A protein has these predicted regions:
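Glycine-rich loop-to-alpha-helix module at the N-terminal edge of alpha/beta enzyme cores
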Residues: 8-89
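Conserved PLP phosphate-binding loop immediately N-terminal to the Schiff-base lysine helix
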Residues: 164-170
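PLP-dependent aspartate aminotransferase-fold enzymes
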Residues: 54-160
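Active-site pre-Tyr helix/loop in NAD(P)-dependent dehydrogenases
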Residues: 15, 98, 166
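Active-site flanking residues adjacent to catalytic metal/cofactor-binding acidic residues
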Residues: 10, 95, 163
């Protein structure tokens, strides 16, 4: 990467995820160029998405359905919703310091005034109802064995536990 002053840097974050193939790999540029010639916004799923969905299902025998999202925020929002619908439970557990998007349910973080072994949550901005961090999210301490105790304690109300194994963008 090169900034406006001509300084060069190594992108050790891979663009926080989406650049796992590097910055501007020729094969990706060519694929984008080829697709643009066919169109770039269709509004409804097309043959390419159906083909990719089948490839993903074949690669993972337990996968029954595939849903494509246009952002990580949208993906986690639907994952939270699906987990709540499937389990009938309401609470989602997140690890302190992780980033899972900009929707109401992901805009929570540990309250720094709370006990690290059992962090309480607060929102990261205006407009998120108080009920979200207080009743719908469980903040877990990252790299702390007390997280397991909290998961066991709240297991009857947990719809899911979201794990970001390598924290990178928060």
């Amino acid at each position: 990467l090169t900034d406006v002053d001509g300084n060069s840097y190594i992108d050790l974050t891979a663009g926080f995820g989406p650049n796992v193939l590097g910055n501007r790999p020729q094969v990706v540029e060519q694929a984008i160029s080829d697709q643009i010639k066919k169109g770039w916004h269709f509004g409804i799923p097309g043959p390419g998405q159906a083909e990719l969905a089948e490839i993903l299902k074949e690669a993972s025998p337990v996968t029954e359905q595939v849903m494509f999202c246009n952002s990580g925020s949208e993906a986690t929002m639907f994952a939270f919703r699906a987990a709540r619908a499937y389990t009938g439970k309401q609470v989602v557990a997140l690890f302190d310091g992780s980033y899972h998007g900009i929707h109401d349910y992901a805009l929570t973080k540990a309250d720094l005034k709370s006990d690290r072994s059992k962090p309480t949550s607060k929102v990261m901005g205006a407009g998120v109802p108080d009920v979200v961090p207080q009743d719908l999210m469980l903040m877990l301490p990252y790299r702390d064995k007390n997280a397991f105790d909290l998961i066991r304690q709240y297991k009857d109300s947990l719809a899911m536990v979201v794990v970001e194994p390598v924290q990178s963008s928060n």
